[in-house]
Regions:
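N-terminal strand-loop element at the rim of the active site
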Residues: 9-22, 28-73, 160-162, 229-231
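A charged, aromatic-enriched C-terminal amphipathic alpha-helix characteristic of glycosyltransferases
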Residues: 323-352
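A conserved mid-protein helix/loop that constitutes part of the nucleotide-sugar donor-binding site
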Residues: 19-24, 194, 198-217, 230-233
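Aromatic "clamp/platform" in nucleotide-sugar-dependent glycosyltransferases that forms part
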Residues: 266
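Short hydrophobic beta-strand element within catalytic cores of glycosyltransferases
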Residues: 283-286
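Donor nucleotide-sugar binding/catalytic pocket of nucleotide-sugar-dependent glycosyltransferases
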Residues: 60, 141-184
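Conserved acidic donor-binding segment of nucleotide-sugar-dependent glycosyltransferases
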Residues: 297-309, 316-322
Length: 354
């Protein structure tokens, strides 16, 4: 039997949806490739994160990776990932998230086939001031000239990439349906009042202020935020419950026993929580941003909203007959947004490059 080709993933943002994406993709590809993951631990990274990975996957922590720009740490991370790659001698390198993408594209000369997935460009993040966003875009523009293919995780992100480089493609994010279904099957379904939920860190990106406004406009509806974060004080409406940080099975239990998934984000890549909610046949009501609007088509498989009033109206509609919407969303995940489809498309691109 021929020796498996070595693939090295370099991941700085190992938390939230990116963590789930990396776990699902690596676990799916390990049957075909010898998988190595060089990563950084974040606050959102599960404490038992190693248990999520197939035992055949090699995990290597990058000690100097950090989210913020820090010249000393970033230079140290540059040499650290070069050393890791020199020891592994991978046949292909795939960089994930903006920080890994910037450092990695400078660190490697392109002799080894290299891919980069932004998972949401940093220059689109509205919590950064305009000057900082211009710097982030300049960094992406310079790095885009390197010998590297950018693979975006949604059509919208791909359109942004094409403004930077033509060496680009996209593969839609996908979810592990089998693993999710297993958790759903083990979850007790309980009677509950009409419930709207969201999932993730309570931070500027996820727009808790808008979530609170929507809840205040619908005092007869129960709202649940699955997660925690620095802006939890923004969630003041009396009909909002905050779960705090919970494990995956508990988060799914909350979701299963709810009716509508709301995602009022200011920006997104292609959210895993949205795809999982579509699979669970929840009515999905999302903001009109890249990622969300690539998956949800207004009135066909959910609702896309541009104002608090539109969110409120959509949730009111969701209290009526919605089976056609939720069934279409479910079928979309079965056909397009699942790990098997995603892994097969990546495998094809890897094979063409090695």
């Amino acid at each position: 039997m021929a020796e498996k080709k070595k693939i090295l993933y370099i991941v700085e943002a190992m938390g939230g949806g990116v963590f789930t994406y990396i776990v699902d993709l690596a676990n799916e590809l390990v049957n075909k490739y010898d998988m190595y993951i060089a990563y950084a631990v974040r606050k959102q990274t599960p404490k038992n994160y190693k248990d999520y990975f197939d035992k055949r996957i090699h995990l290597i922590e990058v000690r100097n990776f950090g989210r913020a720009i820090n010249p000393i740490k970033d230079i140290a991370a540059f040499f650290e990932i070069k050393k890791i790659a020199a020891e592994i001698k991978p046949d292909l390198i795939h960089l994930h998230s903006s920080k890994a993408g910037a450092i990695g594209r400078v660190a490697f000369d392109g002799k080894i086939p290299m891919f980069y997935t932004p998972h949401g460009y940093s220059f689109l993040m509205e919590n950064c001031n305009p000057a900082k966003r211009r710097v982030f875009k300049l960094i992406e523009s310079v790095c885009a000239k390197r010998n590297c293919t950018t693979i975006s995780c949604s059509v919208g992100e791909h359109q942004e990439t094409l403004k930077l480089t033509k060496n680009a493609a996209y593969v839609n994010n996908g979810i592990n349906m089998e693993e999710l279904q297993e958790i759903i099957d083990q979850t007790e379904k309980v009677e509950h009042p009409f419930t709207v939920f969201t999932l993730g860190r309570i931070c500027y990106q996820k727009n808790p202020t808008l979530f609170n406004t929507i809840a205040e406009s619908l005092p007869d509806v129960r709202f649940v935020w699955i997660g925690d974060g620095e802006l939890r004080e923004e969630l003041k409406s009396k009909n909002i419950e905050i779960s705090g940080w919970v494990d995956r099975s508990t988060a799914i239990k909350y979701a299963v026993n709810a009716d509508v998934f709301v995602l009022p984000s200011r920006w997104e890549g292609l959210p895993i929580s949205l795809l999982e909610s579509m699979y669970m046949r929840k009515v999905c009501v999302v903001s009109n941003v890249i990622g969300n609007r690539d998956v949800i088509h207004n009135g066909e498989n959910g609702f896309v909203c541009s104002s608090a009033e539109a969110f409120v109206e959509a949730i009111r509609k969701a209290q009526g007959e919605t089976q056609e919407l939720t069934e279409q969303a479910y079928q979309d995940v079965l056909n397009k947004y699942n790990t098997k489809v995603m892994a097969e498309q990546y495998s094809r691109k890897y094979k063409e490059s090695i």
